[in-house]
Amino acid sequence: MDLWQLLLTLAVAGSSDAFSGSEATPAFLVRASQSLQILYPVLETNSSGNPKFTKCRSPELETFSCHWTDGANHSLQSPGSVQMFYIRRDIQEWKECPDYVSAGENSCYFNSSYTSVWTPYCIKLTSNGGIVDHKCFSVEDIVQPDPPVGLNWTLLNISLTEIHADILVKWEPPPNTDVKMGWIILEYELHYKELNETQWKMMDPLMVTSVPMYSLRLDKEYEVRVRTRQRNTEKYGKFSEVLLITFPQMNPSACEEDFQFPWFLIIIFGILGLAVTLYLLIFSKQQRIKMLILPPVPVPKIKGIDPDLLKEGKLEEVNTILAIHDNYKHEFYNDDSWVEFIELDIDDPDEKTEGSDTDRLLSNDHEKSLNIFGAKDDDSGRTSCYEPDILEADFHVSDMCDGTSEVAQPQRLKGEADISCLDQKNQNNSPSNDAAPASQQPSVILVEENKPRPLLIGGTESTHQAVHTQLSNPSSLANIDFYAQVSDITPAGNVVLSPGQKNKTGNPQCDTHPEVVTPCQANFIVDNAYFCEVDAKKYIALAPHVEAESHVEPSFNQEDIYITTESLTTTAGRSGTAEHVPSSEIPVPDYTSIHIVQSPQGLVLNATALPLPDKEFLSSCGYVSTDQLNKIMP
C-alpha cells in the first residue's frame, strides 16, 4: 500500500510543471485528472453503491466546501469508513479533509487557511483504503454566492384609474461576500409572478440591488425572488426567500376587473360594414356617380337659338336671329378697322343713273337705302375712304381736268364747254326742267331750337311736301348744309356725315362766249364722275365773269357727279366776296351723325354745336351732287 502511495506522489511531483504559474486552467486540471486515472485505474469506474462527489462550492471566493453521497454498501456508511483527501501544487502530498463537521454530514469544509484562489485542487474519496471517486477544480470556478437578503418593496405611484401601480423592489447582497471591497462582483436576477401562477417571469440581470416594477394590478398579489452569481460566470446561487407583494385595498369599483371591450372585433366588423354599405351605395347610384365623375359633354346651345338649326345647317336663320342684337353684324367684325370694309356699289352700272349718293341717302326708296349700307366692298383699304376708286370707264371725260389734258387738248375742251352752256340754256327754258329737280328732292326736315335736335331723313308724305317746298326755294338752300359724304362710322355702327359750307345766294349763269368757259365745265356731262379739286376751283373762279343776261343756271345732266366740298366752298367764298355783300342769314345747325334708324326710310340725325363764325370748318374731302352744285354755286 505504501508503494502505491509513493508512486502516486512521484506522478504528482512529475507533473508539477503543469501547475506552475499563478493560476491553473481547466485543461491542466483535466490532464492532472487523467494522470491520476492512469495511476489509479480503479478510479475510472464508480462501482454501484460506492459514494461520489455531488458538488464543491465557494460562496464568497474565500472558503469552499465539498459534498458527497452515502454509498449503498452498508459497510461504507459507518463513521470513518469514507475519507476525503486533497492535493494542490504547493503541497507535495495528499492530505485529509481538515473539517468534516462545519459543512454538514458527508462534507468537507475548507476555511480561508486552506483555500487558495487560482490554484488547482484535486480531491478523492477512499473507502477502506480504496479510491471510490475523484475530482479536480479551481476555487474561482466553483463560486456560488449565497442568496440576497432583506427583500422589500416600495409603492411608487398609482394610475389615475386606480387600476395599476408601480413599485420598487430592494434587497441586500449576501452578508458573507465582500462586495464593498470589490473582492467579488455579483450580478442579480429577479423573478416574479402572480400568486396563482406557476410560471415565473424573469428580468434581465443587473448589478444593482434595486429594480422598479411597472403596471402591476392593484387587485392582484405577486411573488418576487432574487438570486445572484459572480460576474462572467454561469452558475447562479440559491434564490432568496420569496417576497409577497399585496397592495392595500382600494375602492372596490376601482379595483374591479376592467371590462375588456373587444375593440379589435368591433373595428373589423365596422370596416366590413362600411365596405358593404359603400358597395351597395355605388351599385344603386351607379349612373349618377358615373355622371358626377364623367359628366356628359354639353350640346351646343345659344340662348334664343334652336339647336336644331345648327344641326341642320340653317345658318341664314341663325344669322337672322343674331342680327337682332346690336353687338352682332352679319359678315362684319367689330374689332377690325372700318376702312377695310368700305363698300362701293359699282357692280350694277344701271344703278349709277338712278341718282346721286345724296339722293340715295335721303331717298324714300327702301332698296336704295339698303344698297348704300350693304354695298360690296371693292376697296382694298389701303387708300383713304375719301378717295373712292372708280372704274376708268366712269372717268373717260373727267380725266381732262388734270394738267396734261388742259395742255394737250385746249381746243377740244373749249368746244365742249360751249355745248355745255347751250344745253344749260335749253334746260332752263324748258318747263320740265323746273319740275324735275323738285321731284327728285329728298325729304329732309330741319328742326332748329335752342338746343340741338335730331334731323329726320325720310318721313311721311306731309313732311315730304313741306321739305319739297323748302328745298325748291333757292334762297333757303343757302343756309342748309348738305350731308353728302360718310366721313366715318363709329364702332357702334353710327354713320358720321361730312357737312358742306354755306354759300352765298345767287343764280350763276353761263355765258355764251366760249373764251370764258373753262374746260372743267365739260366734265359736268359725264355720268358717275367726280369733280376734281383743281377743276372745281377754276370753274368757280371764272363763273362770276360770265355775262348775266342769259340768267340760266348751269345744268348738270347727270345725278352722280361730285366735287369736293372743301375746294368748292373755299373757291365760291372767294368769288362771292368780290361781287356780293355777305349774307346776314342765321346759320343752320350741322347734323353730322345718325342718332337712330327708325325704319328703312327714316334716319334721325344728331345735331352738333354751331361752328364759330371766324373759324374755317375743315372737312375731309367730301362730294356734292350736281343738284346741290347748281343751286349753291355763285
From Swiss-Prot:
Any one Gene Ontology BP term: cytokine-mediated signaling pathway
UniProt subcellular location: Cell membrane
Keywords attached to this entry: Cell membrane, Disulfide bond, Endocytosis, Glycoprotein, Membrane, Phosphoprotein, Receptor, Secreted, Signal, Transmembrane, Transmembrane helix, Ubl conjugation
Extracellular face of the membrane: 19-260
Entry-annotated residues carrying Phosphoserine: S337
Bilayer topology term: Single-pass type I membrane protein
Motif extent (UbE motif): 336-345
SS bonds (residue pairs): C56-C66, C97-C108, C122-C136
InterPro entries linked to this entry: FN3_dom, FN3_sf, GHBP, Growth/epo_recpt_lig-bind, Ig-like_fold, Long_hematopoietin_rcpt_CS
Glycosylation sites: N46, N73, N111, N152, N157, N196
Cytoplasmic topological domain: 285-634
Domain of life of the organism encoding this protein: Eukaryota
Keyword Flavoprotein annotated: no
Binding partners and assembly: On growth hormone (GH) binding, forms homodimers and binds JAK2 via a box 1-containing domain.
Name of the protein in its database record: Growth hormone receptor
Native source species: Bos taurus
